């Protein structure tokens, strides 16, 4: 081969390599983004709903064209009884169940269902951000579930078709609960009848009088319109209803490290945003319910509240061995 031909050949190779590189870049730019499904069971105007939408916004802004987050609210994909199973099957990549939903994966998270454990949301937050609280995020890794952060909803209130002032007022009444042994024991302690039902069915159950009452936060009572089918709400602040945002270990490890870092930072920011909304909505949603005049709100006196505490606090001892006395003590210390 002559020198001229050799130069021409080399130029052709360089040209073809450049074309191939450009073609590869073009194909990459045309590739569909990776879908991330975020499923939850509440309305979009709740702290969880707004958090999920903020997460979508941040991920798609920071990783444009690479990831698309699709949010499915109101149990559109999965209900609260099967969303964790769907997560482990990779049918969805992110869910944020209430802490009550994890007892199949770890008994330690039953802590958050203990009645009258936390005095307010500040105490809840102090515990969740403590070493003990942060360790609980990793308590389900062996089962394939990765905890990424806590999301607040608020303190729970009782609602019923008749006034609930003293523990004996709950006797014989049916209350919907999440699938939690602690919550079942809580209502059994006042001789009420706990009924485990999905969140999506609560309104109809109340409307048809299939159950007499339920427990929930002001945000959920308002957004799901439970106040329209319950004549009485008691501001009991007897427990906390918070969530844990989780993914599967399989999905989390499948992400490139740099992308995982961006997604985690986006989630942290979205959770902080959701928690701000949760704090702001407590009084706003409560007042909206009062203004509707659909439900009468009862405020307990210190003596009446003490009666509920005395009736339900024995539940702590019932679950102490499963949860761990050290965790219960750490939670109690957060009230100080």
Curated annotation (Swiss-Prot):
One of its GO terms (biological process) is transmembrane transport. Residues 1-31 form the signal peptide. Belongs to the bacterial solute-binding protein 7 family. It comes from the Bacteria. Part of the tripartite ATP-independent periplasmic (TRAP) transport system DctPQM involved in C4-dicarboxylates uptake. Required for the utilization of succinate, fumarate, L-malate and alpha-ketoglutarate. Binds succinate and malate. This is C4-dicarboxylate-binding periplasmic protein DctP. Succinate binds at residues 48, 101, 176, 216, 220, 243.
């Amino acid at each position: 081969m002559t020198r001229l031909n050799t130069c021409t050949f080399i130029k052709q190779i360089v040209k073809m390599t450049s074309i191939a590189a450009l073609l590869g870049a073009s194909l990459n730019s045309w590739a569909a983004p990776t879908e991330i499904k975020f499923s939850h069971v509440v309305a979009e105007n709740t702290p969880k709903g707004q958090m999920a939408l903020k997460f979508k916004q941040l991920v798609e802004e920071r990783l444009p064209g690479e990831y698309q987050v699709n949010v499915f609210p109101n149990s559109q994909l999965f209900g609260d009884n099967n969303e964790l199973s769907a997560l482990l099957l990779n049918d969805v990549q992110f869910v944020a169940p209430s802490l009550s939903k994890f007892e199949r994966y770890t008994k330690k998270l039953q802590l958050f269902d203990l009645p009258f454990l936390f005095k307010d949301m500040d105490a809840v937050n102090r515990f969740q951000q403590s070493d003990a609280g942060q360790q609980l995020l990793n308590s389900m890794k062996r089962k394939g579930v990765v905890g990424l952060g806590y999301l607040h909803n608020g303190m729970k209130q009782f609602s019923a078709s008749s006034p609930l002032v003293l523990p004996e007022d709950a006797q014989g009444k049916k209350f919907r609960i999440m699938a939690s042994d602690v919550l079942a024991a809580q209502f059994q302690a006042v001789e009420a009848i706990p009924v485990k039902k999905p969140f999506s069915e609560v309104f109809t159950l109340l409307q048809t009088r299939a159950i007499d009452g339920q427990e929930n936060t002001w945000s959920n009572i308002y957004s799901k319109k439970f106040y329209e089918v319950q004549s009485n709400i008691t501001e009991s602040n007897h427990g906390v209803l918070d969530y844990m945002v989780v993914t599967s270990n399989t999905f989390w490890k499948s992400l490139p490290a740099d992308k995982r870092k961006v997604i985690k930072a986006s989630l942290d920011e979205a959770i902080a945003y959701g928690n701000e909304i949760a704090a702001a909505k407590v009084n706003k949603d409560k007042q909206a319910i009062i203004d509707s005049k659909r439900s009468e709100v009862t405020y307990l006196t210190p003596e009446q509240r003490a009666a509920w505490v005395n009736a339900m606090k024995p539940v702590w001892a019932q679950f102490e061995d499963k949860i761990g006395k050290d965790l219960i003590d750490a939670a109690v210390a957060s009230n100080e």
